[in-house]
C-alpha cells in the first residue's frame, strides 16, 4: 500500500502520481534535456500537461522549499553534488506526491552535501510530505527519522523509533552499527528512563550530568 493505494491492483499512473522517487545518483535523475535548473524542474510538470500558471507556481514553490533559487539559471551539471541532489528532489516535489521515496540520497555526497539534503528532508516533512528513505548513515537516521524499518535479507525485523531500534541487542549479528553516541552509552550502561540508550549527544550529556559525571 502506498498513500492508500494497493500497488498490485492500481494503475501505474495513479501510483506514480502518489509516490515520487529520487535516485541515489542525481546524475541519473537529471534529464539533461534542459539548460537551467528552472527548466529542469519544469520538465516533469510540462509532461503532466498542467496549465502554465500552475507550472510557474509549483516551480517557484520548489525553488524556495529546496533553497535553490540562487542557482535557478545555472546548468544543473555545473552544480555541487548537494545542489544537484536538491534539484533532483525539487523536480519530484514539484509534482506534489503524497509520498517521497529517497534511495540513499547522500551516499555519493560529501558531509556538507549530505547535511544540505537532510535539512531539505526535514523541511519537506514539515510540509506534510511522507518521506521513506533508504539510508546507511546511522547518525543521520537517529537525528532525523521518526521511525526506522530494520531489514535483514529483505525480511522485516523491526519497525520502531530510532531509540528502540539502536538499543536492540542483536544489531551486531544483523550487521548494523549504531550511532557513536549510542555505542558509548551502551559501553557505559547509561539508559534513559524508558530503558533505551540515547541516540543523540545532548541526551547522553544529560544522563551523565544527572550523575555528576564530567562530560565536556
Give names to the regions the model predicted.
Residues 42, 46, 53-71:
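Conserved ABC ATPase "signature" region
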Residues 135-136:
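H-loop/switch region of ABC-family ATPase nucleotide-binding domains
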Residues 167-216:
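ABC ATPase nucleotide-binding domains
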Residues 75-79, 83:
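Conserved ABC ATPase signature
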Residues 100-103:
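Catalytic Walker B motif of ABC-type/P-loop ATPase nucleotide-binding domains
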Residues 153-154:
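Conserved ABC ATPase "signature" C-loop
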Residues 1-14:
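ABC ATPase NBD Q-loop/coupling interface
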